[in-house]
């Protein structure tokens, strides 16, 4: 897959009336060997200030010599901004590599028959967990709530 093909694949998972599902996420993450359990995380929630708080925490942790992953939404100019390590967005090649690692599971008929097609938000969340756990392992993540603040 190319970078553009990867973005098109991600964006092809629009919710179209489907709601994000904790059951679907648990099932997917279990099939991916629970990457979310491979590192500690701070979950930033609330009505206002999530982006600023995420940025402050990332800078503090990085300055303290922790390899710090951040997950934010929405992106401002480039999709890759959503997933970053120590303030540097995921590279095009690492986004492709991470997507290729989970695509066979996400696109399998067995998966979709069991829990349905993932939403774009679920897919991007799974990409982030896999990237931080296996492709470019981190010490800690700062994860901004993307739905329901």
Language model feature labels by segment:
Residues 20-23, 52, 90-93, 97:
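Conserved active-site and cofactor/substrate-binding residues in soluble primary-metabolism enzymes
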Residues 46-49, 144:
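Conserved phosphate-binding and hydrolysis motifs of nucleotide-dependent enzymes
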Residues 1-46, 53-66, 71, 110-116:
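Short functional linear segments
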Residues 48-50, 75-76:
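Short active-site-proximal "capping" loops at secondary-structure junctions
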Residues 29, 34-37, 63-149:
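ATP-dependent carboxylate-amine ligase catalytic core
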């Amino acid at each position: 897959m190319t970078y553009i093909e990867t973005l098109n694949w991600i964006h092809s998972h629009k919710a179209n009336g489907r709601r994000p599902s904790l059951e679907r996420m648990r099932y997917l993450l279990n099939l991916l060997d629970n990457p979310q359990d491979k590192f500690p995380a701070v979950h930033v929630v609330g009505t206002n200030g999530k982006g600023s708080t995420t940025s402050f925490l990332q800078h503090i942790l990085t300055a303290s010599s922790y390899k710090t992953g951040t997950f934010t939404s929405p992106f401002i100019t480039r999709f890759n901004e959503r997933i970053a390590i120590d303030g540097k967005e995921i590279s095009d090649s690492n986004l492709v590599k991470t997507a290729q690692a989970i695509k066979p599971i996400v696109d399998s008929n067995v998966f979709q028959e069991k829990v349905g097609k993932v939403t774009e938000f679920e897919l991007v969340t799974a990409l982030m967990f896999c990237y931080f756990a296996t492709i470019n392992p981190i010490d800690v993540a700062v994860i901004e709530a993307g739905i329901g603040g």
